[in-house]
Curated annotation (Swiss-Prot):
It comes from Beutenbergia cavernae (strain ATCC BAA-8 / DSM 12333 / CCUG 43141 / JCM 11478 / NBRC 16432 / NCIMB 13614 / HKI 0122). Its main location: cytoplasm. This is tRNA-specific 2-thiouridylase MnmA. InterPro entries: MnmA-like, MnmA-like_C, MnmA-like_central, MnmA-like_central_sf, Rossmann-like_a/b/a_fold. The lineage of its organism: Bacteria, Bacillati, Actinomycetota, Actinomycetes, Micrococcales. The record marks H126, Q343 as: Interaction with tRNA. Residues 148-150 are annotated as: Interaction with tRNA. One of its GO terms (cellular component) is cytoplasm. Keywords: ATP-binding, Cytoplasm, Disulfide bond, Nucleotide-binding, RNA-binding, Transferase, tRNA processing, tRNA-binding. ATP binds at A6, L7, S8, G9, G10, V11, D12, S13, M32, G125.
Length: 380
């Protein structure tokens, strides 16, 4: 099988490519250039596309004895991932750019280009497993290493893309085992640190990145009774559940901490309140992607709402709005704090991914949009 190995310049993708070679595939390495920003190209940059990353990817390919290319996908990346990140924050939502990158770049632009060139699949260093179910249909499962599992950010792929993907690290027990294997193979990236920053925010300052693109937009901070208790430089910079950075001039009358409970970008207003207002049980997700049969009746499952969050017991089903659009509805067994629109909600049956959607509404707003939720118990 002809396999295109995505080489980021890190240890995971290098070992994944090595394992693809070991499996007997005809492997070609490719490094994706995703930015034309000088700050991200500089040596030592923590974002994507640094000179060091490209050089490390090339050295890994040399050690493995595979051809290596750099593909410029910066236009696609900017027009989809970065643009979505900015527009979502501008709309008062909290996006996950890694999900969008997997959806639009790694398993879309990269995969499509590879297929057009005669490749059969793309191999990446993601921690997840693909198993074959009934009639050979691919299933996405959690990785053996629960601490590194990335099925949450891969659930957006869809079954057709999943069938063209390889995750050679899915069964590896620990990241230490990956590093040891890299060292044994003579890969220079064996001790290279992991990257946890948003890749296109080179200095790690997300708020500064947003300000530089969206500008200063002064507005009021209100309490839940509508009283002005502070000011901000842009509602887009806040997310539900946030406490840090509010800079309120005086404490609440009851002395309790205040958190962001709503972001109203139409009026450029941030609303703050006590922690208990953050607890919700109902979630409505839009644009669902299913990797299993859609549940048209209430079904027991677990859901995950953050990249490294816990698996939360819930009941899920699909619902249809007045316009005929399908949604994923979920009722959590226990209330959850700080869930914001724009985040991804992923449903699981054990280790298997059932489906994914983008959070559109929570709590009573979710019930108002999906009345079916009202029949599953009390609403938080």
């Amino acid at each position: 099988m002809r396999v295109l190995a995505a080489l980021s310049g890190g240890v995971d993708s290098a070992v994944a490519a090595a394992r693809a070679v070991d499996a007997g595939h005809d492997v070609v390495g490719v490094h994706m250039a995703l930015s034309r920003t000088r700050a991200q190209h500089r040596t030592g940059s923590r974002g994507c596309c640094s000179i060091e990353d490209a050089s490390d990817a090339r050295r890994a390919a040399d050690v493995l004895g595979i051809p290596f290319y750099v593909w410029d996908l910066s236009e696609e990346f900017t027009d989809t991932v970065v643009a979505d990140f900015l527009s979502e924050y501008a709309a008062g939502r909290t996006p996950n750019p890694c999900v969008r990158c997997n959806e639009h770049i790694k398993f879309s632009a990269l995969l499509d280009r590879g297929l057009a060139l005669g490749f059969d699949a793309v191999a990446t260093g993601h921690y997840a497993r693909i198993e074959r179910g009934a009639a050979g249909v691919p299933e996405l499962h959690r990785a053996a290493d629960a601490a590194k599992d990335q099925s949450y950010v891969l659930a957006v792929m869809g079954p057709e893309r999943l069938a063209r993907s390889l995750f050679p690290l899915g069964e590896v027990p620990t990241k230490d085992a990956v590093r040891a294997e890299a060292a044994a193979r003579g890969l220079s990236v064996s001790a290279k640190p992991d990257s946890y920053d948003i890749c296109f925010v080179a200095d790690g300052d997300t708020q500064g990145f947003l300000r530089s693109h969206l500008g200063s937009q002064p507005g009021p901070v209100l309490d839940t009774d509508g009283r002005e208790v502070g000011a901000h430089d842009g509602a887009y910079a806040f997310t539900v559940g946030q406490r840090k950075g509010l800079r309120l001039p005086r404490p609440a009358a009851d002395g309790r901490p205040r958190y962001v409970v709503d972001v109203r970008t139409a009026s450029n207003t941030v609303v703050v309140g006590p922690a208990e207002l953050l607890s919700v049980r109902d979630v409505l997700g839009e644009r669902p992607v299913w990797l299993a049969e859609e549940p048209h009746e209430w079904t027991d499952a677990t859901v995950q709402v953050r990249a490294h969050g816990a698996a939360l017991p819930a009941r899920i089903r699909t619902v249809t709005d007045d316009d005929g659009a399908s949604h994923l509805a979920a009722r959590l067994a226990e209330p959850l704090r700080g869930l914001a629109a724009g985040q991804s909600v992923v449903a699981y049956d054990g280790t298997r991914v059932l489906g994914q959607a983008t959070v559109a509404a929570t709590g009573r707003d979710a019930v108002a949009a999906a009345p079916a939720l009202a029949g599953v118990g009390s609403t938080a």
